[in-house]
């Protein structure tokens, strides 16, 4: 199994939304509309080279907190991963990828362009972000996450 890289994210169509350090925005805060989008957020540290350090997903929320809630959990050090990110004094570039663009990283992972075109999309009403998250864990390793 290989580590997910920035190249994998770029090939899937991910966009950089900013940089965090210690659970706070570093060098400017993105607009709330960007942070409240449902989908996947990936953290990449220069220290880890082009490998993705961690991943988080955000669903639809009435409060529209989105990735801001993830940052709050990091600042509060609510898990081992959050404590590591909060305490290691490293800057992380944050990439955003909507669920609609996850096919190359989940069901289409490792397939050529032709096979990818015929691979199913995630459109089932029962498809969950949790299921996509597990597919990512099946296909890739992440520097700071074991699963």
UniProtKB/Swiss-Prot annotation:
The keyword Cytoplasm does not apply. Transmembrane segments: none annotated. One of its GO terms (biological process) is symbiont-mediated perturbation of host cell cycle progression. InterPro entries: Phage_Ndd (IPR009514). Keywords: DNA-binding, Host-virus interaction, Inhibition of host DNA replication by virus, Modulation of host cell cycle by virus. GO terms for molecular function: DNA binding. Disorganizes the host nucleoid and inhibits replication, but without host DNA cleavage or degradation. Only the architecture of the nucleoid is affected. May act on the host chromosomal sequences that determine the structure of the nucleoid. Binds to dsDNA but not to ssDNA. This is Nucleoid disruption protein. It comes from Enterobacteria phage RB70. The lineage of its organism: Viruses, Duplodnaviria, Heunggongvirae, Uroviricota, Caudoviricetes.
């Amino acid at each position: 199994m290989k580590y997910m890289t920035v190249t994998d994210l770029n090939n899937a169509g991910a966009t950089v939304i900013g940089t965090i350090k210690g659970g706070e925005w570093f060098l400017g805060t993105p607009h709330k509309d960007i942070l409240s989008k449902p989908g996947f957020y990936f953290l990449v540290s220069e220290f880890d080279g082009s490998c993705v350090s961690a991943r988080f997903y955000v669903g639809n929320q009435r409060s529209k907190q989105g990735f801001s809630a993830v940052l709050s959990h990091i600042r509060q050090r609510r898990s081992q991963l959050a404590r590591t990110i909060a305490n290691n004094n490293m800057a992380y570039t944050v990439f955003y990828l909507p669920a609609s663009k996850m096919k190359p990283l989940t069901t289409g992972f490792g397939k050529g362009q032709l096979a990818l075109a015929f691979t199913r999309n995630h459109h089932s009403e029962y498809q969950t972000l949790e299921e996509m998250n597990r597919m990512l864990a099946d296909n890739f390793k992440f520097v700071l996450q074991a699963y």
